[in-house]
Design a protein with these regions (language model features):
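Acidic, Mg2+-coordinating catalytic module of metal-dependent nucleases/exonucleases
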Residues: 87-183, 190, 194, 266
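Short beta-strand micro-motifs in enzyme catalytic cores
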Residues: 3, 15-17
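Interdomain "pre-motor" coupling segment immediately N-terminal to P-loop NTPase/helicase cores
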Residues: 186-255
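Two-metal-ion RNase H-like nuclease active-site motif
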Residues: 1-10
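Conserved DEDDh/DEDDy metal-dependent 3′-5′ exonuclease domain
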Residues: 13, 20-119
């Protein structure tokens, strides 16, 4: 059974002043007592909330082997396109009533339900990419466990440890949207979360969609990953030829076939290519 939680913390004492929780069975708790909160949550195996990994779990000190689902980390992955989810503004929940942890718990429940719907609307290949990138992380692993998702792989493949062909897997979903010769294996190994968030934005197909500020604060390498995927030309693939080639851009945006030459030097072309 899952329980949705939220806490109000006194900024001076750094202690919980108010606990709110709502269980899957409909039971609701609003209390100042940690003992009451612990007893209420103990009947569940999964704990969910918004930003509970970096906030609520630190103050509640829950004891037990709970599966943790944090709707904060899921939101940029599953709602990358404008308009963003109505319940989320940057890293905060949009709530109707301030300082009401029960209300916030209910909002977290609603958000998780919408995130599950959004997950089910992804293509099977995109689901597989996100899962293989993120299932081993604390931020996302609990979500996959809760929805009982695992990427299909044969028993023989698991036994012999077949390695994922990341270039093939990603390009199957994002062909024409990223450089075909990007170092996917390196990105997967060093920046799995950053890569997932980058692919979410790329897959949104909306040039005005942006990565939330809190993501950039916590995962600043997202900028570097995006540059490696979309703004670093290999000079030898369809994406780079169409999107990053200076002559193609000149023709597409201005209708000219060649850059002007000044004293035998293509200064305009050099300026574009060095930008």
């Amino acid at each position: 059974m899952i329980v949705f939680i939220d806490t109000e913390v006194n900024p001076q004492t750094k202690k919980v002043a108010d606990y709110g929780a709502m269980r899957e069975d409909g039971a609701v708790l609003h209390s100042h007592s940690k003992a009451d909160f612990d007893a209420f949550v103990s009947r569940c195996d999964t704990v969910c909330g918004h930003n509970i990994i970096n906030h609520d779990l630190k103050y509640t000190a829950l004891r037990g082997n709970y599966t943790v689902v944090d709707t904060l980390f899921l939101s940029p992955l599953l709602f990358p396109q404008r308009p963003y989810h109505r319940l989320v503004k940057d890293d905060k929940l949009q709530v109707d009533e301030l300082n009401n942890p029960v209300n916030d718990s209910m909002k977290a429940r609603d958000l998780l339900n919408d995130e599950i719907v959004a997950w089910n609307q992804l293509t099977p290949n995109r689901q597989k990419i996100y899962y293989l990138l993120l299932y081993g992380t604390f931020e996302f692993g609990g979500f996959f466990k809760y929805i009982r998702y695992s990427a299909n792989q044969s028993l023989l493949g698991r036994i012999v440890g077949v390695q994922t062909d990341w270039a093939q897997l990603i390009l199957k979903e994002y062909e024409g949207k990223v450089c075909s010769h990007a170092n996917f294996d390196m990105l997967v190994k060093q920046y799995p979360i950053e890569l997932a968030y980058s692919l979410a934005i790329i897959g949104a197909d909306d040039i005005f969609s942006i990565t939330p500020a809190w993501v950039l604060r916590n995962y600043p390498q997202v900028v570097n990953v995006m540059n490696l995927l979309c703004n670093t030309s290999c000079g030898d693939c369809g994406y780079c030829h169409q999107r990053l080639d200076a002559h193609c851009g000149l023709k597409e945006f201005f209708g000219y076939d060649e850059f002007r030459i000044f004293d035998g030097v293509p200064m305009q072309q050099q300026a574009v290519e060095s930008a």
